[in-house]
Amino acid sequence: MRRAALVLALALLSLATAPGAAAAAPKVQHLSYRYGPLTITPGQNTISLDGDKVPRPKVPGYIVGFRPNLVRVKGGVPRVDVLHLHHAVWLINGQPTFAAGEEKTQVSLPRPYGWRHDPADAWVLNHMVHNLLPNRDRVYLTYDIDFVPDSSPLARGMRTVQTRWLDVEGGSAYPVFDVHRGSGRGGRFTYPDQAPNAYGDGPARNRWVVQRDGVLVQTAGHLHPGGLYTDLVLQRGGRRKNLFRSRAKYWEPAGAVSWDVAMYATGRKWRVAVKKGDVLSVSATYDSGRASWYESMGIMPVAFAPGVKGGADPFSGKLDRRGRLTHGQLPENRNHGGERGGLPDPRALPDGPGASAPLAISDFLYGQGDLLRGGAASRPPVVRAGQPLSFVNRDASRDIFHTITACRAPCNRQTGIAYPLADGPVEFDSGELGFGPAGFTAAANRDTWATPTNLKAGTYSYFCRVHPFMRGAFRVKQ
């Protein structure tokens, strides 16, 4: 009896101490970080590179999930038609590892994979926060990390992944391309496949040659409005296989025209065995039937486990290509625009003065013909057929970029994430008038532009792609 009682007492003691032991050896930690505060200047659309104390886990382990966001210092997530997270890229030891665009894709790796983390790693943050309004603001870049510390029992079975950055304009700090309305085939345009001479005389920039056998574990695409999907393709000798199509899911009532979107990522069972010498490539497909899409992107970061065995033979037919949405609809994306506003229809306005000198853009206003100015200042300036109308951006001295981009008349409705669009009956776009470091800026590195000289008689509406509340018009006469 005494022995039985002793055994029972020891059993009860072990049950009592078990929760404490589990708490001392956590499995997955959910950590929240923020970088900033960042002061956002009026109309800002510049790229910054910061290596100053980017927060990260303080102990070694594995990062298995990453969820980015943008929040105001005073609290709350800003609307996307007010402040737009164009991109944030977390570079670790010089390599792009985690990233965010305005679709705010959330990454979660299947077990037992993770990014190896050492507190001594060098973290640098490349970020571009786009202010669509002429106001100052202050924000934090936030990111929630799912983390397996080395003290966790899960750490013993973890397998290390690396991010392989596949980009249709790989190697560029601002990797963009233009999609012109009517380009491609059947209202769709795929870059670089349908771009004439996409890379000039240089090598293809959308490819990566596998240097070591291993397993692909996860991927998801990054697109801009108008984007439909990205494709990840493997080539082995003379054989090709589409490994995954990352589709864009739009909640936007107007269709594929806004940031009211989420991307499909690979499913939890997606694994692809790759061999040294395999070539992976990425392409991006956009809707080219409705509007033009300037400064578009197509990126697919891939989590790759080198030296790991397993995964499906890409040519076996056993690859699970079903995707999963990384998140649902976000409330900051619900101001769509397009409602009737108080701006005039420029087609009904009397002629403005003849344009003999460049029209100055200053303080977020176009010179003559700005619809927000009212009165005589809103009347479209007149230029004779065959003659250009010139613009100069006086705000460029304050690092504020503006465009003159054709939109469908009257182009006078309320601004939102889906309005206005670059859908004028005649296409023209100035690029972002302003200056910045070559290759590291959205700016065109000029502050002047002139309209095409082949425009027919009529009234032409335009807006600023950087600050879409800005609207203007001009008139061509014989």
Which functions belong to the PLM regions below?
Residues 15-24, 478:
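C-terminal region of N-terminal signal peptides and the immediate post-cleavage residues
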Residues 341-478:
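Extracytoplasmic copper-binding redox domains, predominantly the cupredoxin/blue-copper superfamily
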Residues 24-215, 220-340:
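Beta-strand-centric surfaces of beta-sandwich/beta-rich domains
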Residues 7-17:
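Bacterial N-terminal signal peptides
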Residues 1-4:
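Positively charged n-region of N-terminal signal peptides that target proteins for export
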